[in-house]
């Protein structure tokens, strides 16, 4: 059976990994994240690798390999060739839904592209330093980042991310939900937002916000507990980031009991 592979690459960008070079057929990016970089616009990108033969299983991929009556019987796999998938998205999906990025958002995202590689270097550099601090902090029970040898995906990280992965990760603080929120509320330059991959450092408590509608079993499957804190490390100076995490106040990690 023919199967196409689609990769959602919202948390990583082409500067770190190129999924099509590893066999992906379709790659989806959230331009709102690293591409724009400032959480100021909404947009997305769909990249068609152009290597998948949609006609080899015409029944399964009938929208691409069989005639489209709304276009006088045109077969997208014949008319557009390697670009059949993205061509149908523009010709049919956009036609039917009317989705279109605003010119101003497009302008902002294009500006973001100009500094993408530079920003990502700083994101990754900062994130690895925060991970290194947290993993050695006695008030932290676990850090979930693939760069760490005990992470279940560490081997994949070493294989596919020789330049380092993204800057979004979680950790478990000792003391449960109460201590998690004490820590979150104490952070000053971190913004409490559900967005990620912003130049601003972001923090959130998934258990009571983004994933609060999940059942206990679903939360367990996602390894989300009352102690889980998600960080999206920004491009601020690393000394400023670490100083916020490590200030001698009862609400900060160095003295949480």
Named regions from a protein language model:
Residues 47, 170-172, 232-234:
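Short hydrophobic/aromatic beta-strand micro-patches
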């Amino acid at each position: 059976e023919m199967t196409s592979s689609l990769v959602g690459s919202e948390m990583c960008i082409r500067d770190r990994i190129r999924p099509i070079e590893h066999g992906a057929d379709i790659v989806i990016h959230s331009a709102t994240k690293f591409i724009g970089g400032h959480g100021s616009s909404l947009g997305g990108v769909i990249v068609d690798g152009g290597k998948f033969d949609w006609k080899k299983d015409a029944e399964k991929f009938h929208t691409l390999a069989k005639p489209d009556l709304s276009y006088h019987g045109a077969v997208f796999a014949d008319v557009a060739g390697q670009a059949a998938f993205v061509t149908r998205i523009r010709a049919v999906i956009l036609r039917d839904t009317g989705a279109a990025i605003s010119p101003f958002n497009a302008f902002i995202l294009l500006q973001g592209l100009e500094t993408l590689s530079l920003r990502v270097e700083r994101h990754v550099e900062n994130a690895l330093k925060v991970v290194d601090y947290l993993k050695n902090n006695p008030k932290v029970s676990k850090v979930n980042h693939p760069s760490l040898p005990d992470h279940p995906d560490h081997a994949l990280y070493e294989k596919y991310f020789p330049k380092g992965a993204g800057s979004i990760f979680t950790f478990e603080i000792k003391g449960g939900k109460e201590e998690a929120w004490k820590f979150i509320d104490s952070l000053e330059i971190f913004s409490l937002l559900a967005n990620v991959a912003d130049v601003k450092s972001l923090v959130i408590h998934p258990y009571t916000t983004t994933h609060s509608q999940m059942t206990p079993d679903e939360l367990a499957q996602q390894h989300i507990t009352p102690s889980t804190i998600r960080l999206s490390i920004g491009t601020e100076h690393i000394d400023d980031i670490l100083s916020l995490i490590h200030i001698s106040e009862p609400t900060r990690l160095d003295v949480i009991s």
